[in-house]
Design a protein with these regions (language model features):
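Specific transmembrane helices
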Residues: 2-140, 168, 240-275
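Transmembrane alpha-helix/helix-exit interface in multi-pass inner-membrane proteins
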Residues: 100-109, 143, 163-184
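Residue-level hotspots within the lipid-embedded alpha helices of multi-pass solute transporters
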Residues: 136-141, 173, 201-206
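Functionally important transmembrane alpha-helices
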Residues: 23-26, 165, 190-254
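Hydrophobic/aromatic residues in alpha-helical transmembrane segments
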Residues: 102, 138, 151, 208-212
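Membrane-interface interhelical connector segments
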Residues: 146, 150-151, 182-193
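Hydrophobic, membrane-facing alpha-helical anchors
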Residues: 3-5, 83-85, 121-122, 178-180, ...
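Membrane-interface helix/loop boundary segments of multi-pass membrane proteins
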Residues: 142-174, 217-222
Length: 275
């Protein structure tokens, strides 16, 4: 018996991790569309937004506190000494910052501007009352302390790594949907850019999850690997003045990497995973 068999409450985890944020974020969306944006309204949006982000982590924490073996496994996987190497950091930066910069270079051959390499210092979206940079850096931390503390392992207990990634990809697309209704938020901008941008966003999530889960498993289920990858992807896609079409090129780069990754590590993706 492996430790993964202890991660045996996926329905509980995923149900509450979907329902609570959805309720909070639809409330946030309602406040964002009020004609008068007072300080109280903006604070309300911030509180609801952060509470929605944090809630899956709290659901996971509730499950960890009920089982000593799970709690010990969590502490082990949060150790920076476990598989968190300079090689891992370099690979993550190459996959995130490297891919977006490569996409920007390729885009110039199709007439897009080198201005994309300008570090704007201003994200493409806004957030009520707190800096958008706070959202970009805080979200990867609290999300991965949910998804890669309990969520991924709960799926790996039943499914292969590939199936786990596909299931979670669908879940994560739906999980983000309420944010598309929040005025001025990143996801509402993606929808406003049109169907192609929305499809690319959804497709990129599946590739992102496949790569992140591969890194997670290759580096000993270290949660900080997932946090860093998510953080680097968020900041890398917002720090430059990247054209939305260039992100489609980045998705294609991810696709090529994923094809090579699965071909090389076929057994890891399709055999029963053992922690």
């Amino acid at each position: 018996m492996t430790i993964l068999t202890k991660y045996n409450r996926p329905v509980f985890f995923y149900f509450w991790s979907m329902l609570i944020p959805a309720v909070l974020w639809f409330g946030m969306a309602y406040l964002s569309h009020l004609p008068e944006q007072t300080s109280a309204t903006q604070i309300g949006q911030t509180v609801l937004g952060i509470a929605g982000l944090v809630s899956p982590m709290l659901v996971a924490l509730h499950l960890f506190r009920q089982d000593a073996d799970l709690w010990n496994d969590l502490k082990h996987r949060l150790s920076l000494r476990q598989h968190f190497s300079p090689f891992a950091i370099g690979l993550i930066l190459l996959l995130t910052y490297g891919s977006i910069m490569a996409a920007q270079v390729i885009s110039t051959f199709f007439g897009y501007s080198w201005v994309q390499f300008h570090i704007s210092g201003q994200p493409s979206f806004q957030s009520a009352f707190v800096s958008a940079w706070f959202v970009l850096t805080f979200a990867p931390l609290v999300e991965e302390l949910a998804w890669h503390s309990y969520g991924t392992d709960a799926l790996l207990n039943k499914f292969s790594l590939f199936s786990t990634s596909m299931i979670f990809g669908v879940y994560w697309v739906i999980w983000h949907l309420p944010l598309a209704f929040v005025k001025g938020y990143y996801h509402s901008h993606v929808v406003a850019e049109g169907a192609l941008a929305s499809i690319n966003y959804a497709a990129s999530i599946f590739l992102f999850v496949l790569i992140m889960n591969w890194l997670y498993c290759k580096f000993g289920r270290n949660i900080w690997i997932s946090v860093l990858f998510h953080l680097a992807a968020n900041t890398g896609n917002e720090i430059f003045n990247t054209h939305p079409d260039t992100k489609i090129i980045q998705t294609l780069i991810f696709l090529l990497f994923v094809i090579a990754m699965i071909a090389k590590d076929h057994k890891l993706f399709f055999a029963k995973y053992s922690a």
